[in-house]
Amino acid sequence: MNIFYDANKIYEAGTKAIKSAPFKYQSQLFEVNHLLLTAELQRDIKEWKYKPTKGSKFTINERGKIRNITTNDMIDKTVNHLICDNVLTPAITPYLIYDNGASQKNKGVSFHRKRLEVHLHQYYRKHKSNEGYILLIDFSKY
């Protein structure tokens, strides 16, 4: 069965979309109508009628910096989760290095701390010294 037609997968994706911001009005409204919206989305996908919306655009002033925000509709977020969780993630995961934990399940902060410790021990065994460098990179405003 095509995952895009599977109501259970669509419902799961909608639940994940709600979890991103359960306190927001849009999420709460979606949750109240979750089953109905799942059925409607399933029908629209089957009949090739689904079209992403433009979303909402607004500006906020955060700590003195003006930010232009674009947000997607909950239905679009559901479709994004459906595609990412069931198609893209399984397709690219086999090609990622083990140490890449960016946004991957079960690869949080503790995973990276343990991996850092493993690499430090490997470095010490190889060079018999603690003298060396660690390069830390943080991408911002990209």
Predicted segments with their positions:
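Conserved pre-motif C helix in the palm subdomain of viral-like polymerases
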Residues: 65-97
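Active-site-proximal segment of RNA-dependent polymerases
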Residues: 84-142
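Short, compositionally biased low-complexity segments
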Residues: 4-21, 53-57, 84-92, 124
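Non-catalytic, polymerase-adjacent accessory regions of viral genome-replication enzymes
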Residues: 1-43
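Non-catalytic, well-ordered alpha-helical scaffold segments
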Residues: 8, 35, 39, 76-81, ...
